Swiss-Prot record:
SMART domains: DIL, IQ, MYSc. Residues 732-761, 755-784, 780-809, 803-832, 828-857, 851-880 form the IQ domain. Residues 7-56 form the Myosin N-terminal SH3-like domain. One of its GO terms (cellular component) is cytoplasm. This is Myosin-5. Belongs to the TRAFAC class myosin-kinesin ATPase superfamily. Myosin family. Plant myosin class XI subfamily. GO terms for biological process: actin filament organization; actin filament-based movement; cell division; fruit development; Golgi localization; gynoecium development; leaf pavement cell development; mitochondrion localization. Residues 1148-1463 form the Dilute domain. Disruption phenotype: No visible phenotype. Residues 59-729 form the Myosin motor domain. PROSITE patterns: DILUTE (PS51126), IQ (PS50096), MYOSIN_MOTOR (PS51456), SH3_LIKE (PS51844).
Length: 1520
């Protein structure tokens, strides 16, 4: 790798003994050595240094391949920066690095976060474990390949939790929602707590360390659904069962069982954990924050889910308890040499308990522990073990039982979950131990590191393959990249024969082999191997140089731990156990051992398992997750550099970086390269060159070689980036000096101008003072002249005004006298005319009133007489049920006669009106004649007055004294005429008084008649109710008769008797006839004929309903803004009284019609049409219907059209125009406004119809809202991030800054304008269909809430969106939405603009300047009061200024936010920083009813199909 180009002033990284790497500034260069002044003030001289990127984002980068300098200190600093911001995930290409936060971060693992990452390409959102899972799942679905996810890291790095999150996400993608019972994904997820209970334990480095490796194969069918799974485990740490060190713990299951409920503890004969030898070797019995009792119950529940029955669970925990009792069996020396016996009673008691739990003989168990049987050709020898060997036998038995119990649990889980032989593909999740290097490394560490060597080789090949694919994709020339291959280490370990494992197996097969002989064999075999070494101070230790460093192994227990056999006495003991579960474990083992006669060791079997694992991984597309433990104290907020670097090396991350650095470590997109280094060649930017050509010209100008230009990126060798940065720093330094020079020049010029301006101001002041003195003198002289002139004018004007006032007073007195005389004459004349007019009008009105009252009294008397007669006839007819129908027919005939008489009365009344009109015309002619005479007299008087005025004026011209000229004759005649008129006036006044008395008496009589008429009206109502009840009885009797006739027809074939029934015809309401119909049929009797059959009532009603449904199924539009269909349905239902019946089908048929119209409907116009109709109809029902316990009981004054003909005629009498003068007889028509709608006590079908209609209204509303969301959602993806401007903008932006800042370019807001266009389209559609403004405002309110949620969540999940320029872009788009809200008016938008409060405040925070000066209180109370502390913390840590280079809020504010977020995380149930979309219904029926204006139902014209039918003539009625 070429040395980076460094100049004085460059910032570099140098090694530090405390921080691993520290940054500083180069102060001097001496050959290959540089002098660096670190940030601590210390000067370091070194030749090992790396350039530092001073322009790196303050919050780090989410993909370390984006680092300008890809080296160890850059990677370490980037991880540390992101860890401080709680950004625990970081990409390195396709590799995910996960740093354990050691605290709960539930908000990034909730279901809504899974929804965000579902189907999103890798790298589009912030790094996350869900993104890796989604990438594997999408690759499997799209390419049909098997995929695997390898999770690695040292103990405590978070591998187990990461694996659980991966499995949760895969179950979320491939799960089956709504499936009853145990699903495959549930069983896979619940297998984790079971395996953790039996395979995890507390270690020095981790409270929940997995002591085994695990590979989970999740199988998927062709639809991408989980169809099966298999779990493979590797190398369980068996020695932990018997031996633990302080402060570690044994496996969790032992402590869980000791914390079980009291009944279980009694059942398994357990005590406190500190009383068991296998547990009390350590002082740690409990874990912080873990309740073993609840974990025990949770484990039992998980075992139920994975398919382990209650009997099997009981057997499992009996075995676990037996192992604890086995550990408490101690041995003492026996009587014989090298023999042993049970030490004491306590040990004997535990022996008996263990035997009881294992259901075997206690003596047999004792013999199996302390005796061995040796078979020779001559005899069978039984020998006793000494106490030490007996303890070893006990421990061996415990380890054997536990390991096979663990294997049984794994096999049971696999059997329960089941594997799908027809699965299309799999995703494997590998959770395996990371590289280990301790002070004491035994056989377990040897196997673990062997595994990691295998995985590292696979990892290196994968990284090399990714590099090769990147170069091939960009179509650049590349050569082979060398990388360290660890094949020699693998051969050292696994070569057969001659490898360490082979030599270990060989030593195990010889009984006399020891660890010394085994070590000597290794030293002799590998003394020349580069990767093998012998420590100087040990005879049995050996050292292997792994890829992550040298590890020294202690071979003391290699042979013992490698042996995989079971003692024959142990096997015989448990095979004879009465417990089928225990016997089954050892029986299966016996079958396996009998099938294989070769020697089997742990190492060989592990090597075979590892070989099988690598074959599986090689057949899949791998995805890597490297887990990092930031510190060894397991606390949050601590980042230990040396510890992390060691793990990066062990995890192969630095090796992957080294492979990248061996090729082209720096890769920049053309746009980014020009944006950063375009200033090195300004003439290139000013030219109209393609981006690729421009980049080529810049590199050629700087004489760089050995770089590559791909299709979209530039690939630079190591060191070339530093060289370009050095030249860029030089250019920027020169530019800074030019700016400083120009600034100093500007300051000097500014100082000179200020001095000059001060002198000018002083001179101006002095000249002004002189000018003001001269001006004052001239002003005094002018004022004196002005005073003299005004005084002379005042004296002359006062004399003139006095003369003029005297003249005016004289003239005014004369003219007033003349006017008063003329006014008196006119007032007398006007009074006479008014008296005459009132007297004549009173006479005419009195005559008309008498005629009207006489006619009404006559009509009322006659109607009362007829009503009484009909009542008597009805009472007589009611005594005989058989004659009831005849009475009804006669009654209807009588009513017909009354109708004819009514016509006659109308004609008489018309004649009276005509006579009255003629009389009034005569009176008007007489009045007109008198007015003409009055005008002539008035004209004569005026002429005489004019002549008198002329004479007076002529006389005044001769003589100044006034002369009064009197014509005595005329005055006398006028006086006589006035006297005569006064006499007439007095006589007329006397007559008027008499007429007034007569009028008062007539009013009294009229009131009496009104009371009588009101009493008659009440009686008529009572009669109508009686008739209605009788008619209902007739209808019920007719129904019974019909049923009887049908039964008779089924018995007898003859039906001739039915032909003798009287025939009736249907009389409908027409403009020529004044009869009525209510949609059902009204029948009038006619002469009986046998030619015209009668239609049944139900059939006719069915036809009317069919016609109504056929009409509303079409789009019949609107009438003056009112939905015709809703008004039509409402009027028909009211007229047919459908709301008041117990059973009817019309409601269900209307609902079915609406459902068929909107089913699978994508046309917004149709949905809005039915939304308007449904809302209007619901408004009618809300104001009309009221729930009642009985039938449709309404007040007589407000009931609808009666069903009988007599009732309808009576109702028409009360509502006739002739009765307009009597309010108590005026009926209420259904055609009035909503204020006149009558209240109906609805039955159950009507109330159910209202509920169904409400449900359909909400459904249509939801369909319109979801359709709008579907249209807007694709546009929002382009609205959250500013589109990249073309390269020409880099130049034009410098010269046209002002204009671009004022008005955003049209292409930049095109996506926002598309949203506005979509909103306008839907608004026009809803307004064209007269959708209520409340519903429109609610729709747009929820749409704006959806926009707020989508934009805000995207902003929090994508760091590239949290930039200054992106904030300006979104703010410009929001301004477009605000303008649209203003144009659409508040009536239709409501509070929609307020729904964007989260994104508005977030964007406002992004674009404010001087963020570091803002305190947390100012941010939370003034800038962003709506945002939560988690959301503010997320935005503050992700913010980066790509325009001005400013920083986010201060570190103190960040620290305070982090502390508050931590507190909230501990206390809150859900502390997700993401918003949830609200899909509820935001209105109620009362809201709709209150918001809608009154609708005149009667003013709506029915469609032609209805208008042409005579049964619907009631729809043509109009309200007065």
């Amino acid at each position: 790798m070429a040395a980076p180009v460094i100049i004085v002033g460059s910032h570099v990284w140098v090694e530090d003994p405390h921080l691993a790497w520290i940054d500083g500034e180069v102060t001097r260069i001496d050959g290959i050595n540089v002098h660096v002044k670190t940030k601590k003030g210390k000067t370091v001289v070194t030749n090992v240094y790396f350039p530092k990127d001073t322009e790196a984002p303050s919050g780090g980068v989410d993909d370390m391949t984006k680092l300008s300098y890809l080296h160890e200190p850059g990677v370490l600093r980037n991880l540390e920066t992101r860890y401080e911001l709680n950004e625990i995930y970081t990409y390195t290409g396709n590799i995910l690095i996960a740093v354990n936060p050691f605290q709960r971060l539930p908000h990034i693992y909730e279901t809504d976060m899974m929804e965000q990452y579902k189907g999103i390409a890798l790298g589009e959102l912030s790094p996350h474990v869900f993104a890796i899972g989604d990438a594997a799942y999408r690759a499997m679905i799209n390419e049909g390949k098997n995929n695997s996810i390898l999770v690695s890291g040292e103990s405590g790095a978070g591998k187990t939790e990461t694996t659980k999150m991966l499995m949760r996400y895969l179950a979320f993608l491939g799960g089956r929602s709504g499936v009853e019972g145990r699903t495959v994904e549930q069983q896979v997820l619940e297998s984790n707590p079971v395996l953790e209970a039996f395979g995890n334990a507390k270690t020095l480095r981790n409270n929940n360390s997995s002591r085994f490796g695990k590979f989970v194969e999740i199988q998927f069918d062709k639809n991408g659904r989980i169809s099966g799974a298999a779990i493979r485990t590797y190398l369980l740490e068996r020695s932990r069962v018997c031996q633990i060190s302080d402060p570690e713990r044994n496996y969790h299951c032992f402590y869980l069982l000791c914390a079980a409920p009291p009944e279980d503890i009694k059942k398994y004969k357990l005590e406190n954990p500190h009383k068991f030898h296998y547990l009390n070797q350590s002082s740690c019995y409990k874990l912080d924050g873990v309740d073993d009792a609840s974990e025990y119950l949770e484990t039992r529940r998980a075992m139920d889910v994975v398919g382990i029955s209650n009997e099997e669970q009981e057997a499992i925990f009996r075995v676990v308890a037996a192992i604890l009792h086995l550990g408490n069996i101690d041995f003492g020396k026996g009587e014989e040499i090298d023999s042993s016996v049970i030490k004491d009673k306590d040990s004997r008691s535990h022996l008996n308990m263990a035997a009881e739990l294992l259901m075997c003989n206690a003596q047999s168990l004792e013999d199996a522990l302390i005796r061995r049987v040796m078979v020779t050709p001559e005899e069978i020898i039984t020998r006793t073990l000494d106490p030490d060997n007996a303890i070893a036998s006990r421990d061996t038995l415990a380890k054997t039982i536990y390991s096979h119990l663990f294997d049984w649990i794994v096999n049971k889980i696999n059997t329960s979950i089941g594997q799908d032989p027809r699965s299309k593909s799999i995703i494997g999740v590998l959770d395996i131990y990371g590289f280990e290097s301790f002070k004491c490394n035994s056989f377990e560490q040897f196997c673990i590191n062997f595994t990691n060597e295998k995985l590292q080789q696979h990892f290196n090949q994968h990284v090399f393959k990714m590099e090769q694919e990147e170069y091939t994709k960009e179509e650049i020339a590349w050569s082979y990249i060398e990388f360290i291959d660890n094949q020699d280490v693998l051969e050292l370990i696994e070569k057969k024969p001659g490898g360490i494992i082979s030599l270990l197996d060989e030593a195990c097969m010889f009984p006399k082999s020891t660890h010394e002989t085994f070590s000597q064999k290794l030293f002799q075999t590998f003394k020349e191997h580069e990767r093998f070494a012998k420590p100087k101070l040990s005879r049995t230790d050996f050292t292997i140089s792994h890829y992550a460093g040298e590890v020294t192994y202690q071979s003391n227990h290699f042979i013992d731990k490698n042996k995989d056999y079971i003692v024959a006495e142990h096997q015989a003991l448990f095979t004879a156990s009465n417990c089928k579960f225990v016997a089954g474990l050892f029986h299966a083992l016996h079958e396996d051992s009998s099938r294989s006669s070769k020697f089997s060791s742990i190492g060989s079997r592990f090597k075979q398992q590892l070989h099988s694992l690598m074959e599986s991984l090689n057949g899949t597309e791998p995805h890597y997750i490297r887990c990092i433990k930031p510190n060894n104290v397991l606390k949050p907020g601590i980042f230990e550099n040396f510890n992390v670097i060691h793990q990066l090396r062990c995890g192969g991350v630095l090796e992957a970086i080294r492979i990248s650095c061996a090729g082209y470590p720096t890769r920049l997109a053309f746009y980014d390269f020009l944006d950063r280094f375009g200033l090195l060649a300004p003439e290139v930017l000013e030219g109209n060159y393609d981006d690729k050509v421009a980049c080529q010209m810049i590199l050629d100008k700087k004489s760089l070689t050995d770089y590559q230009i791909g299709k979209t990126k530039i690939f630079l060798r190591a060191g070339q980036m530093a060289e370009l940065d050095a030249r860029r720093a030089e250019v920027l330094g020169n530019a800074a000096r030019v700016i400083q020079r120009q600034f100093r020049t500007c300051m000097a010029r500014k100082n000179y101008r200020s001095i000059r301006n001060a002198a000018i101001v002083l001179q101006s002041f002095l000249r002004g003072e002189i000018a003001r003195a001269v001006h004052k003198k001239l002003r005094i002289e002018a004022a004196a002249l002005r005073v003299q002139k005004n005084f002379r004018r005042y004296v002359d004007r006062k004399s003139f005004v006095t003369t003029r006032s005297s003249t005016i007073v004289l003239q005014t007195g004369l003219r007033a006298m003349i006017a008063r005389s003329e006014f008196r004459l006119r007032r007398q004349r006007k009074a006479a005319i008014v008296l005459q007019a009132h007297w004549r009008g009173r006479q005419a009105f009195s005559y008309y009133t008498r005629l009207q009252k006489a006619a009404i009294v006559t009509q009322c008397a006659w109607r009362c007489r007829l009503a009484r007669r009909e009542l008597r006839m009805l009472k007589m007819a009611a005594r005989d049920t058989g004659a009831l129908k005849d009475a009804k027919n006669k009654l209807e005939q009588r009513v017909e006669e009354l109708s004819l008489r009514l016509h006659l009365e109308k004609r008489l009344r018309t004649d009276l009106e005509e006579a009255k009109v003629q009389e009034v015309a005569k009176l008007q002619e007489a009045l007109h004649t008198m007015r003409l005479q009055l005008k002539e007299t008035t004209a004569m008087v005026v002429k005489e007055q004019e002549a008198a005025r002329v004479a007076i004026e002529e006389a005044s011209s001769v003589n100044k004294e006034p002369v009064v000229v009197e014509d005595t004759e005329k005055i006398d005649s006028l006086s006589n005429e006035i006297d005569r008129l006064k006499g007439l006036l007095s006589s007329e006044t006397h007559k008027a008084d008499e007429a007034q008395h007569a009028y008062q008496s007539a009013l009294v009589q009229n009131e009496e008649l009104c009371k009588k008429l009101e009493e008659a009206g009440r009686k008529i109502d009572q009669l109508q109710d009686s008739v209605q009840r009788f008619q209902e009885k007739v209808f019920s009797l007719e129904s019974e008769n019909k049923v009887l006739r049908q039964q008779t027809l089924t018995i007898s074939p003859t039906t001739r008797a039915l032909a003798l029934r009287p025939k009736t015809t249907i009389i409908q309401r027409t403009p020529e006839k004044d009869t009525f119909s209510n949609g059902e049929t009204t029948q009038l009797q006619e002469p009986e004929t046998e030619d015209r059959p009668q239609k049944s009532l139900n059939q006719k009603q069915q036809e009317n309903q069919e016609l109504l449904l056929k009409s509303i199924s079409e789009d019949i539009g609107f009438s003056e803004g009112k939905p015709v269909a809703a008004c039509l349905i409402y009027k028909c239902l009211i007229h047919w009284r459908s709301f008041e019946v117990e059973r009817t089908s019309i409601f269900n048929r209307i609902i079915e019609t609406i459902a068929s119209a909107i089913e699978m409907q994508e046309n917004s116009d149709v949905l809005c049409y039915w939304l308007s109709n449904s809302a209007t109809l619901l408004m009618f029902l809300q104001r009309t219907l009221k729930a009642g316990a009985t039938g449709s009981i309404t007040t007589p004054r407000r009931r609808g059209m009666p069903s009988s003909l007599f009732g309808r005629v009576s109702q028409s009498f009360r509502g006739s125009p002739q009765s307009a003068g009597f309010p108590f007889m005026t009926g209420r028509a259904i055609g009035g406004g909503l204020d006149e709608l009558r209240q109906v006590e609805a039955k159950y079908p009507a109330l159910l119809f209202k509920q169904q209609l409400t449900a359909f209204l909400e459904k249509i509303y939801g369909m319109i809202r979801d359709k709008m969301k579907k249209e807007i959602s694709p546009l929002l993806a382009s609205c959250i991030q500013v589109p990249r401007t073309p390269r020409s903008g880099l130049v034009k932006g410098r010269s046209q800054n002002t204009q671009n800042n004022v008005v955003a370019p049209k292409p930049m807001i095109a996506h926002w304008q598309n949203i506005v266009t979509c909103l306008n389209g839907h608004l026009r559609t809803m307004r064209a269909n007269y959708v209520p403004s409340l519903l429109i405002s609610k729709v747009f309110g929820q749409i704006f809430s959806f926009i707020n949620v989508q934009l805000f969540n995207s902003l929090l999940l994508r760091r590239e969106c949290c930039s200054f320029s992106n904030g300006e872009y979104v703010k410009t788009g929001l301004a477009e939405l605000e303008k649209w809200c203003h144009d659409a008016t508040e009536e239709f938008v409501g509070s929609a603009w307020d729904e964007l409060k989260h994104i508005r405040q977030a964007v406002g925070f992004l674009v404010i300047h001087q963020k570091p000066k803002k305190s947390l209180k100012e941010i939370t109370t003034e800038l962003c009061p709506v945002l939560s502390i988690q959301q503010l913390y997320r935005i503050s840590t992700m913010y980066w200024d790509d325009k001005y280079g400013t920083h986010s809020v201060s570190t103190e504010v960040i620290a305070t936010m982090r502390a508050e977020v931590s507190d909230v995380s501990k206390s809150a149930i859900s502390n997700s920083f993401l918003l949830d979309d609200d899909s509820s219904i935001p209105f109620s029926l009362d809201d709709i009813s209150k918001s809608m204006q009154n609708v005149e139902v009667a003013e709506v014209d029915p469609p032609p199909l209805i208008r042409q039918n005579s049964n619907f003539m009631f729809l043509l009625e109009r309200s007065d």
